Regions:
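Mid-chain, well-packed structural core segment of small domains
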Residues: 64-96
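Intrinsically disordered, low-complexity and often Lys/Arg-enriched segments
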Residues: 1-6, 123-124
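Charged phosphate-binding loop/patch that engages nucleotide di/tri-phosphates or the phosphate backbone
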Residues: 100-124
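N-terminal first-folded block
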Residues: 6-55
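Glycine-rich nucleotide phosphate-binding loop and flanking beta-alpha elements
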Residues: 16, 63-65, 118
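Acidic, metal-binding active-site segment of PIN/NYN-like and related structure-specific nucleases
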Residues: 49-67
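A general structural motif
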Residues: 3-5, 53, 72, 107
Length: 124
């Protein structure tokens, strides 16, 4: 289901194609790889995403387990083998983004992998 515009914070391991896709839909996107945030520690990025009320998108499973509160609005973890190309990751994200009940993302960690996704409440 599609609805509303969101604010995203894309970790540096997320392909530019996904940033372009979200921006073209009108979403507000901070792309770590494209600016001065590149190379900053995960905890700094996490806090920044949380402070700005953004959805944190990453491929780094370790970044999703930070015991820092408050958490970002939601966390989207892109899973799959390291051999997945930017094209494959973009297609995987697009399939998820076109199916998900977007208004239910807040407060969830979403694990997106080839063939589907799972949502889990963020533990506080």
């Amino acid at each position: 289901m599609r609805s509303g515009l969101f604010r995203f914070f894309l970790d540096e391991n997320v392909p530019r194609r996904i940033a372009d896709r979200l921006s073209s839909e009108g979403h507000d996107v901070v792309e770590v790889a494209a600016g001065p945030l590149r190379g900053k520690p995960d905890d700094y990025l996490w806090r920044r995403a949380a402070a700005e009320g953004r959805i944190f998108v990453t491929r780094d499973i370790g970044a999703t387990a930070l015991p820092i509160r408050p958490a970002p609005l939601a966390i989207i973890l892109l899973r799959g083998p390291e051999t997945l190309t930017a094209v494959h990751l973009d297609a995987m994200f697009a399939a998820f983004w076109n199916l998900v009940e977007r208004e239910q993302l807040a407060g969830h960690l979403v694990s997106v992998r080839p063939g589907g996704y799972r949502m889990h409440r963020i533990r506080i």
